[in-house]
């Protein structure tokens, strides 16, 4: 194939004009344009490649996801309206989503993830940030605040917990509220061990039967209330980092946390958090409102919002209430 060469004068003109054109385009995007440019990449954080995704304008709002072992994807498209006034910085925690997975699962700890969040903040030159954590991400956000609150302007804790002991008590009550038939079915599956069953490709995750029983019949009333996601599939929910999940959550099912997340006992230390804090929870949340109330009582500069007709996915059940709660809090 014949390749045509650029004429040198034309090439020189292209080189001169390209940066100016790009700069002009960026200015247009940043000055009231309806176009929102997305940026993504990786930060080498303590030897682990952490994926980040940036979208929006304004002060940085750093967002950490739950699971543990999920990814930032479940926030979208629901948090997109916040990008109009805030620079949203999503990350996938180590071992999750697009971030690097570890050969040694013992490296999956809250403490290590705190250092990853800090490394991302420093590498991206974000300065002081608002940190928003949902579910497990809320526990991670608390751990970060307990060590690095000088780097926070605000803290937002969504559908989370500060005491794993208290969370396990919530799960006991959740099980007791199930039908006797479902309780027995889940008990039988958990008693026989949740891993190592089925086909070779199934042995390192929950069986389909358990996913349906636990994440479908068991959890669903606590995930959604007002706007149940018609695309929710408990089996699809199993697409996550299983080695991480087993290390952190544990191996004995959805209704007891007995992995290294047992270390999450922060309640008595929360009084040291002095940054303005917003605590969000659904009235039918998997992380019961009593857990949010316990955090609210300990953090002096906190505001508690309980969303009506909302489960764990508050920003899905009550998207406008969620947006207004976050934006009004950050305006103060």
Walk through the language-model features, giving the residues of each:
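Active-site loop/oxyanion-hole signature of alpha/beta-hydrolase fold enzymes
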Residues: 93-136
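Short beta-strand/loop motif that positions the catalytic acidic residue
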Residues: 273, 279-281
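Catalytic active-site module of serine/aspartate enzymes centered on a nucleophile-bearing elbow/loop
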Residues: 302-332
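Conserved alpha/beta-hydrolase catalytic His-Asp/Glu region
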Residues: 193-252, 260, 269
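Flexible "cap/lid" loop of the alpha/beta hydrolase fold
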Residues: 156-200
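Conserved HGGG/HGGXW glycine-rich cap/lid loop of the alpha/beta-hydrolase fold
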Residues: 48-101
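Conserved alpha/beta-hydrolase "acid-adjacent" motif
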Residues: 286-291
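Conserved hydrolase catalytic core segment
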Residues: 127-173
């Amino acid at each position: 194939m014949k390749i045509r060469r650029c004429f040198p004068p034309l090439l020189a003109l292209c080189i001169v004009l390209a940066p100016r054109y790009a700069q002009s385009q960026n200015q247009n995007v940043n000055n009231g344009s309806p176009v929102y440019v997305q940026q993504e990449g990786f930060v080498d954080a303590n030897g682990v490649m952490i994926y980040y995704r940036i979208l929006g304008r304004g002060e940085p709002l750093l967002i950490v996801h739950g699971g543990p072992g999920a990814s930032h994807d479940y926030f979208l498209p629901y948090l997109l309206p916040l990008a109009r006034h805030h620079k949203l910085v999503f990350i996938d925690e180590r071992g999750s989503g697009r971030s690097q997975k570890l050969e040694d699962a013992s490296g999956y700890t809250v403490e290590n993830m705190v250092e990853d969040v800090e490394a991302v903040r420093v590498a991206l030159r974000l300065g002081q940030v608002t940190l928003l954590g949902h579910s497990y991400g809320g526990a991670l956000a608390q751990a970060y605040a307990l060590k690095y609150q000088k780097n926070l302007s605000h803290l937002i804790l969504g559908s989370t917990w500060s005491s794993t002991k208290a969370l396990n008590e919530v799960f006991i009550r959740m099980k007791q509220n199930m039908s006797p038939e479902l309780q027995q079915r889940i008990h039988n599956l958990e008693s026989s061990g949740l891993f190592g069953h089925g086909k070779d490709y199934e042995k390192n995750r929950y069986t389909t039967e358990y996913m349906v029983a636990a994440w479908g019949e068991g959890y669903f009333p606590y995930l959604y209330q007002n706007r149940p996601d018609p695309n929710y599939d408990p089996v699809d929910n199993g697409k996550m980092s299983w080695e991480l999940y087993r290390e952190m959550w544990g191996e004995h099912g959805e209704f007891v946390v007995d992995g290294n997340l047992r270390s999450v006992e922060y309640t008595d230390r929360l009084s040291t958090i002095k940054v303005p804090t917003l605590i969000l929870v659904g009235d039918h949340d998997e992380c019961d409102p009593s857990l949010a109330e316990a955090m609210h009582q300990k953090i002096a500069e906190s505001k508690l919002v309980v969303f009506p007709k909302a489960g764990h996915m508050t920003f899905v059940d009550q998207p406008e209430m969620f947006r207004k709660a976050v934006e009004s809090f950050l305006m103060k």
